[in-house]
Amino acid sequence: ATIRFVDNQKDFETKLKSIGPDLLNDKNMTYQVFKKVMDKHKEKNIVKVLMDQKYISGIANYLKSEILYHSGISPHNIIKNIPESKMKELYQSARLKIVSSYNKGGASLRHYADIEDKKGQFEFTFEVYNKKVDKNGYKVIAEDTLDKRRTYWVKEKQVLYE
C-alpha cells in the first residue's frame, strides 16, 4: 500500500479520480459495473486487473489469492476466456472476501500493536494465502504472477479457461 499526503483539495480530488471503484464502500459497484471494467480489459490477465487500483480499488494481495481460490479461477486466466457464470462468481467472491476481511479487522500474519499500543489480532481466515496445503489437502502453489506479486493458488481447484 502507498500513503500519499496532499495539502490541497485539488490534488486530493485528482488522486481520488485516478482510483477505481471500491468493492467495499462504493454502493454503485454492482456486478454490471464490475463486468464493464473486466470487459474493458478483456485482453489482460485477471491478476493484473484485480491488483491495479486504477481499475478496481480495495483488493489487497492476500485478497487476490483468496478471491481467486474461492471462485475457482486460475490466476493465469485472460479475462475474455472466463465464462460469464464464473465472472459473476468472481464478483460475488470479491465482495464476500473483502467484507469478511473488513468485518474481522483485516488480515495479518502476525500480531501487532496500533499507535496507542493496543494489541490487535486479525481474525480473517486464510484458505490459501501463505499456506502449504488447502482444506482438501491439495498443494498450494506460491508463485510470482503477471502482477509481479506472490499469488497462492491450487491447480486442482482453480480452472484455466482457454
Please describe what each predicted stretch is.
Residues A1-E162:
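Structured catalytic/nucleic-acid-binding cores of DNA maintenance enzymes
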